[in-house]
Regions:
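A domain-start/cap signature at the N-terminus of enzymes
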Residues: 184-235
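Short, surface-exposed "cap/lid" segments of acyl-processing enzymes
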Residues: 220, 225-259
């Protein structure tokens, strides 16, 4: 009896020991599997680690694997987006569901494709999307590319006088380049086109010498010469007379009308506003803009000229037109500048000279042969990077220099490409170079 009891006790003890050993083995095996999963996690093998955690019933470990794997896919997608592999990036972002901002990045892959199209609507939508993703360098580059393309598109629309569409783009572009200024001008032009006749400039009641001159109009501030037919190729010209804010001699207008520049809308200011140049030059551009709007055209680039003391408002207008209107002045014709460049307050200062150089305006100075780099105002313009050309005149007379320029095709040459010298039989051209050192 005792022997049988001892046998059973031994069997039970063996079973207990076996169970304990099995439990210890299971614990050790679980710990080993967990260590294996952690090692795999550290190595970036998230899928394999997830299988182990899932087998262990470790939901926290599974969640960690899912989060790390999603972040890895997310970062890989961003790298592909920045590298321009939009299809591959789209596939990765699509697999992430609602993780972080993948919905926006997924859209960005599609927006990039809009760069290949001329569709303004798609480009505008793309611009908004990339602006929302400004923290990514690839998106910042895309914003610049799309903005540049939209800006060019707006200029094309404005040239075709589709101002409502152009204004919509300028408004979207906000502070990009001169968009805000152009938006303001575009809206004013639309208002002018809708204005009643009594508020217009170019009406029959304002015709000047209608029996002898075609398409010339007058108002209190200026004379207007209007092309027979305006188009997107129409050029724009503003003239400032000499004197100290004196009434312009009509001879300059009449000489111009002997040989007017075809397809050029010209504004001849009746006074040069010497004592308030910014106000007067802005008024000149306002008049040009209104006349252009009534003709169904929009100016983005102009040529200006000034005789005698009027040369100084012409030169200053380069900066004013750019800063206040977003208009680039292609070239300035200075016709025997008055006071022999000696009145310092009339000259461009250094800051204005540098602004004019950045704009890229060319200056043609029709002067007597002894005038050049020996004038501080001219030297300053040249040494600050401006393209300045001295134009020697065979007929070196103060008044005749201007009359010849008006009547002998100089304006038409100036609003053109100026690829060849103008009237070389009476003019010589010498490009001035900056001082060495």
């Amino acid at each position: 009896m005792k022997r049988r009891t001892a046998i059973w006790i031994g069997i039970i003890a063996a079973l207990v020991l076996l169970g304990a050993v099995a439990q210890i083995f299971r614990i050790c095996r679980t710990d080993l599997r967990r260590e294996q999963a952690e090692a795999l996690l550290e190595a970036g093998a998230y899928a394999h680690a997830r299988e182990i955690y899932d087998g262990l019933g470790d939901t926290e470990g599974v969640a960690r694997c899912d989060a790390l794997q999603a972040e890895e896919v997310y970062q890989e997608g961003i790298q592909l987006l920045q590298a321009g592999d939009y299809d591959s990036a789209r596939q990765l972002f699509s697999s992430l569901g609602s993780y972080k901002d993948t919905a926006t990045l997924l859209a960005a892959c599609g927006w990039q494709e809009a760069l290949a199209f001329e569709d303004t609507g798609k480009l505008t939508e793309a611009l908004r999307g990339f602006q929302a993703l400004g923290q990514y360098s690839a998106c910042q580059e895309a914003v610049e590319q799309i903005s540049e393309r939209l800006f060019t598109r707006a200029e094309e629309l404005a040239a075709a006088f589709k101002l409502e569409e152009a204004c919509a783009i300028w408004e979207e572009l906000g502070s990009y380049e001169s968009s805000a200024l152009l938006l303001q001008r575009g809206r004013r032009a639309l208002d002018w086109t809708a204005a009643p006749e009594e508020q217009r400039l170019l009406i029959p009641a304002n015709r000047y010498l209608s029996k002898s001159l075609k398409n010339v109009y007058v108002c209190d501030q200026a004379y207007f010469v209007i092309p027979e037919e305006c188009s997107s190729e129409t050029r724009f010209f503003i003239y400032y007379p000499g004197g100290r804010d004196e009434e312009m001699s009509v001879d300059y207008l009449l000489y111009y009308m002997m040989n007017p520049s075809p397809n050029t809308l010209a504004v001849f200011m009746r006074k040069n506003g010497l004592d308030h140049m910014r106000e007067n030059t802005c008024q000149a551009i306002d008049l040009l803009d209104q006349a252009a709007a009534e003709c169904g055209v929009f100016a983005r680039e102009i040529v200006v000229a000034g005789s005698s003391l009027g040369a100084y408002p012409a030169m200053h207008s380069v900066v004013y037109a750019c800063e206040a209107y977003g208009i680039r002045t292609d070239c300035v014709l200075s016709l025997d500048a008055g006071s022999d460049w000696m009145e310092e307050e009339l000259l461009l200062d250094e800051a204005e000279c540098r602004k004019a150089a950045r704009i890229g305006t060319e200056f043609y100075l029709f002067e007597s042969p002894w005038v050049g780099m020996n004038r501080e105002g001219i030297r300053m313009m040249v040494n600050t990077g401006n393209r300045v050309t001295m134009v020697g005149c065979t007929f070196d007379d103060h008044v005749r220099i201007s009359l010849d320029a008006m009547g002998m095709g100089v304006v038409d040459w100036a609003v053109g490409d100026r690829a060849q010298p103008c009237n070389p039989e009476i003019y010589s051209f010498t490009r001035l170079e900056p001082d060495v050192g």
